[in-house]
Amino acid sequence: MPTACDVGTKKNSKGYKVSWIGYKLHIDVADGGIPICAVLTSASTHDSQVAIPLAKMSSERVTHLYDVMDSAYDVPQIHDMSRQLGHIPLIDVNPRRDKALKDELTAEKKRCRLVGHKTAEAIRYNERSTVERVNARLKDEFGGRVVRVRGHAKVLCHLMFGILALTANQMMILVT
């Protein structure tokens, strides 16, 4: 995996491009918001490229049954790897330029809304929001937003101290 400092760009929820220079921290989180493992890569590395190594590291450290991911991870290699590890992949469908599939997903959402049910994707989003909260807490409360060191090793060390403090804090919250 690339570890050089570079520029990462993605589209936000409103369709605008957002760019940043540096690195990207990929975190695998258990229930309760406890980080299991983390990988620091170049900012331009797509999340799906890190999913397989991250899942293998996590499966070596803890035993779990489900791999819950969003539609960015909807590729056959990740589904296959998840099954090989003995997990059940719960990955949202990404229609990717398939108009028929996109229309079918829209119709399903409409039917669920009319009946008063939530779609499976909406329910899984609530589970995935745990990871988003961990990322937000790492940035806001544990020094992940402003990193004043240079180099992969130093940035990784800085962020791992934040992960360590976050893990200890989450475990104290669960105990008390």
Which residue ranges define each predicted feature?
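Polybasic low-complexity intrinsically disordered regions
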Residues: 1-84
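Residue-level detector of flexible, active-site-proximal loop/helix-junction positions
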Residues: 42, 96-97, 153
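Catalytic-loop motifs flanking and including active-site residues across diverse enzymes
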Residues: 50, 130, 134, 160
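Helix-centered, glycine/charged polyanion-binding patches within enzymatic domains
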Residues: 71-141, 148
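Charge-patterned, long linear interaction tracts outside catalytic cores
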Residues: 146-176
